[in-house]
């Protein structure tokens, strides 16, 4: 029992450290606002969710964001957003995958998780995160919209920012995370399951 707990802690630590490092390998995606950067730090959390269970995936999300919050200048808002959206993705995929651990169900679970993540990210940004950035960081909404419009002319207000920025960005992110996880999961799962 004690050995199993220790092994789980080591695995979560390794996956969290990997996720934290992957947060720094981010890049801008054309047609999306500059503050939306794609990184693959949710892949280790998704792998944990599939191999060890959905709550382990959420733990990886939590640990990577706590570490990142200590060295960032987003006032913690970016990390709360990253944790919320990433956790929704990995938990949804993991909980569905647990019912039937096949490649087909992994694909289904990641497709559903991508849609859930995109909708949830849209709602959270509209009602929580964008207003928080305004209030805590002092970013005027006009500046956020202006920066977004520079990347995509269809973005003219908060609703179009969600429709042409936040939602499609998270769909793209979910697809990319899913593809990478499909490529590496089979190789990593034996190590993580035992």
Predicted regions: what they are:
Residues 1-194:
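Loop-helix junctions at membrane interfaces
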């Amino acid at each position: 029992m004690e050995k199993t707990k220790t092994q789980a802690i080591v695995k979560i630590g390794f996956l969290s450290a990997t996720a934290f490092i992957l947060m720094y390998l981010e890049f801008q995606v054309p047609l999306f606002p500059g503050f939306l950067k794609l990184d693959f730090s949710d892949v280790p959390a998704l792998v944990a969710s599939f191999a060890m269970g959905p709550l382990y995936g959420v733990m990886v999300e939590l640990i990577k964001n706590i570490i990142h919050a200590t060295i960032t200048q987003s006032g913690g808002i970016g990390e709360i957003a990253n944790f919320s959206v990433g956790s929704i993705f990995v938990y949804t995929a993991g909980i569905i995958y647990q019912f039937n651990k096949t490649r087909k169900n992994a694909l289904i679970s990641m497709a559903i998780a991508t849609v859930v993540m995109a909708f949830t990210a849209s709602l959270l940004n509209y009602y929580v995160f964008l207003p928080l950035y305004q209030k805590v960081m002092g970013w005027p909404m006009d500046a956020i919209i202006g920066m977004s419009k520079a990347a995509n002319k269809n973005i003219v207000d908060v609703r179009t920012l969600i429709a042409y920025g936040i939602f499609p960005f998270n769909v793209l992110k979910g697809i990319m995370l899913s593809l990478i996880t499909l490529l590496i999961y089979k190789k990593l799962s034996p190590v993580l399951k035992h």
